[in-house]
C-alpha cells in the first residue's frame, strides 16, 4: 500500500532540519505557520504526528511556532540524529505524516542499535533504496539488502575533514560491492578532473571508507563543512569512480517499482534554494555575504549579476555578485549587506535562513526567512570578535599602516565600497574618529609590549650563552692542568 502522506502531490507539507549540537526543538516555517496553522487557537495548538515506523499517533504541543511537549519523545523513539531532514505532510486537520530522511533527502531504514557505526556524523550519508521506513523490529529482506543504489550524499563535517576520511554507510558499500575491498578509488569533479584516493575496509567495525585526499578534494572544489553533496558511482571495477554532481537525482534511481513519488527531487530542490548559516563577526566587518560555488551553480547565479536582498519587513537592498580569485573561489555579495544585517537585527551566534527566488523577467532575490537564537559550535573568538590568527594579522597590518601613513588611513577607509554611506541606515551605530585613534594606539602598545617581551627573552638567552662560555673556559683550564701533569 502506498504511503498516503506522500502519494498525493496536493498535500501541504514542510520540512525541518534537526539542528546540530543540542536537543533540538524545531520550528514550523513562518510562511507555512501563518497560512495553515495560525488562528487555530495556536496558544494551545496540538499537532498529531504519524509515521511508517509505528502504528500509533503522537501528540505534540506547539509553543508559538516551536515544537514543545511530546516532541522529544517522538524524536527519541524514531532515533533522529543531528542534521536529519524531517518532512511533515498534512493528511488531516492538524495531523501530519512524518518522514525521517536522514542526512540525505530520501527515506532511510531504521537500523538496529547494536549495529556498528564507525562515525556518527557520517552515518546517514546515502540515498536509500528502501520502499518504506521500517521499524527497528522489522529485519531487512535479502532483496532490500542487495538492491543497487548508485547515489551517495556525502555530509562534509569538520571531523571527516580533519581526519581526511569519509566513511561509507554499510548499505551503500554492500549494494555496490565496495565493502571488504582495499584499492584505489577516484573522485571526479563536475569539470572532469579526478583525484585518486584509497578505499579501505576495517574488519573491526565492518566499515568501508575513503581517505588520502578527501580534505584536498573538498578544499579545491569548495565543499564546505556542514553541507551535503551528491556523488554518483559511474564506474565500479578494479578502480571505482565517484563523480560529483549538482543536478537533481533521477526519480527512478532513488525509488524502485512503480512508485511515482518525487520526494527526493522536491526536497532537494527546496534545500538548494535555501541558504542557512550562523552569523559571525567577520560577516559584518568584511561587509560581504559569501556564497559557496555549489549553491551559486545550482541556482545559476553568475558573476556581476544583480541580486536584491529583501529583509524581514519587505525592504529592498540592491546588491551584485562578485567572485573571488583562484580555483574553487567563492562568490560573494558586498553592496547593501551591512544595512541588510542591521534591518534584520542579526546578532553573533544566531542562525538565519535566506531563500533564493528567481522570477521570470525580474531581478533575483535573497529573501530573509527566519532566524534562531540557538547557537552552534563556533571557532573561539577574542573580545573583538576575531579568531586569534585574524587578530595577529590585523595587529601587524594596522601597526605598519599607521606608522607609514598616519591619518591618511581614515580617508582610505571612508573610500571603501563596502562602507558606502548610501547603504547605511541613519540610526546605524558607527565608530567615531577618536575610537579609531584609540584602537590604533592600543594596537601599537600591544605590538611594543610583544617586542619588549621578545627582547627580554633574547637577553635571558644571551646570559645563558655567556654562562656557557665561562663554563667552557673553566673546562679548558682544567684540561690544560691535566696535560701539564701528564707531561
Swiss-Prot record:
<protein>
    <recommendedName>
        <fullName>B3 domain-containing protein REM2</fullName>
    </recommendedName>
</protein>
<dbReference type="Pfam" id="PF02362">
    <property type="entry name" value="B3"/>
</dbReference>
<keyword id="KW-0805">Transcription regulation</keyword>
<dbReference type="GO" id="GO:0009555">
    <property type="term" value="P:pollen development"/>
</dbReference>
<keyword id="KW-0539">Nucleus</keyword>
<keyword id="KW-0804">Transcription</keyword>
<dbReference type="InterPro" id="IPR015300">
    <property type="entry name" value="DNA-bd_pseudobarrel_sf"/>
</dbReference>
<dbReference type="InterPro" id="IPR003340">
    <property type="entry name" value="B3_DNA-bd"/>
</dbReference>
<keyword id="KW-0677">Repeat</keyword>
<dbReference type="GO" id="GO:0009561">
    <property type="term" value="P:megagametogenesis"/>
</dbReference>
<feature type="DNA-binding region" description="TF-B3 3">
    <location>
        <begin position="274"/>
        <end position="371"/>
    </location>
</feature>
<keyword id="KW-0238">DNA-binding</keyword>
<feature type="DNA-binding region" description="TF-B3 1">
    <location>
        <begin position="11"/>
        <end position="104"/>
    </location>
</feature>
<feature type="DNA-binding region" description="TF-B3 2">
    <location>
        <begin position="151"/>
        <end position="247"/>
    </location>
</feature>
<dbReference type="GO" id="GO:0003677">
    <property type="term" value="F:DNA binding"/>
</dbReference>
<feature type="region of interest" description="Disordered">
    <location>
        <begin position="379"/>
        <end position="431"/>
    </location>
</feature>
<feature type="compositionally biased region" description="Polar residues">
    <location>
        <begin position="409"/>
        <end position="431"/>
    </location>
</feature>
<dbReference type="GO" id="GO:0005634">
    <property type="term" value="C:nucleus"/>
</dbReference>
<dbReference type="InterPro" id="IPR039218">
    <property type="entry name" value="REM_fam"/>
</dbReference>
Amino acid at each position: 500500500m502506498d504511503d498516503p502522506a506522500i502519494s498525493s502531490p496536493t498535500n501541504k507539507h514542510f520540512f525541518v532540519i534537526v539542528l546540530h549540537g543540542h536537543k533540538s526543538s524545531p520550528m514550523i516555517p513562518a510562511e507555512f505557520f501563518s497560512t495553515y496553522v495560525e488562528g487555530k487557537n495556536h496558544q494551545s495548538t496540538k499537532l498529531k504526528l504519524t509515521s511508517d515506523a509505528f502504528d500509533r499517533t503522537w501528540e505534540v504541543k506547539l509553543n508559538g511556532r516551536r515544537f514543545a511537549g511530546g516532541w522529544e519523545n517522538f524524536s527519541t523513539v524514531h532515533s533522529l540524529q543531528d542534521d536529519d531532514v524531517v518532512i511533515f505532510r498534512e493528511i488531516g486537520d492538524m495531523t501530519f505524516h512524518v518522514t525521517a530522511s536522514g542526512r540525505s533527502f530520501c527515506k532511510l531504514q531504521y537500523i538496529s542499535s547494536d549495529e556498528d557505526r564507525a562515525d556518527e556524523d557520517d552515518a546517514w550519508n546515502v540515498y536509500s533504496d528502501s520502499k518504506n521506513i521500517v521499524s527497528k523490529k522489522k529485519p531487512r529482506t535479502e532483496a532490500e539488502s542487495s538492491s543497487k543504489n548508485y547515489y551517495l550524499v556525502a555530509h562534509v563535517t569538520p571531523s571527516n575533514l580533519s581526519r581526511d576520511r569519509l566513511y561509507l554507510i554499510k548499505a551503500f558499500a554492500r549494494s555496490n560491492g565496495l565493502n571488504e575491498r582495499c584499492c584505489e578509488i577516484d573522485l571526479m569533479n563536475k569539470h572532469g578532473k579526478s583525484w585518486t584516493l584509497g578505499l579501505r575496509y576495517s574488519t573491526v567495525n565492518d566499515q568501508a571508507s575513503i581517505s588520502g585526499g578527501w580534505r584536498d578534494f573538498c578544499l579545491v572544489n569548495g565543499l564546505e563543512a556542514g553541507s551535503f553533496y551528491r556523488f554518483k558511482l559511474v564506474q565500479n571495477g578494479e578502480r571505482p569512480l565517484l563523480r560529483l554532481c549538482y543536478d537533481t537525482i533521477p526519480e527512478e534511481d532513488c525509488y524502485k517499482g512503480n512508485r511515482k513519488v518525487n520526494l527526493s527531487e522536491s526536497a532537494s530542490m527546496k534545500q538548494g534554494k535555501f541558504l542557512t548559516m550562523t552569523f559571525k563577526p567577520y560577516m559584518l566587518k568584511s561587509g560581504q555575504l559569501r556564497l559557496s560555488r555549489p549553491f551559486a551553480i545550482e541556482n545559476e547565479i553568475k558573476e556581476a549579476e544583480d541580486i536584491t536582498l529583501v529583509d524581514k519587513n519587505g525592504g529592498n537592498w540592491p546588491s551584485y555578485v562578485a567572485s573571488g580569485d583562484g580555483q574553487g573561489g567563492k562568490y560573494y555579495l558586498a553592496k547593501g549587506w551591512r544595512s541588510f544585517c542591521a534591518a534584520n537585527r542579526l546578532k553573533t551566534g544566531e542562525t538565519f535562513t535566506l531563500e533564493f527566488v528567481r522570477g521570470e523577467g525580474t531581478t533575483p532575490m535573497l529573501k530573509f526567512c527566519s532566524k534562531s537564537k540557538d547557537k552552534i559550535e563556533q571557532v573561539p573568538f577574542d573580545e573583538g570578535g576575531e579568531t586569534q590568527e585574524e587578530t595577529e594579522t590585523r595587529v601587524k597590518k594596522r601597526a605598519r599602516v599607521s606608522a607609514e601613513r598616519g591619518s591618511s588611513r581614515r580617508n582610505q577607509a571612508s573610500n571603501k565600497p563596502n562602507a558606502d554611506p548610501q547603504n547605511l541606515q541613519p540610526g546605524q551605530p558607527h565608530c567615531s574618529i577618536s575610537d579609531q585613534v584609540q584602537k590604533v594606539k592600543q594596537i601599537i602598545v600591544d605590538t611594543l609590549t610583544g617586542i619588549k617581551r621578545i627582547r627580554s627573552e633574547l637577553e635571558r638567552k644571551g646570559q645563558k650563552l655567556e654562562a656557557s662560555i665561562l663554563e667552557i673556559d673553566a673546562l679548558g683550564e682544567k684540561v690544560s692542568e691535566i696535560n701539564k701533569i701528564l707531561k
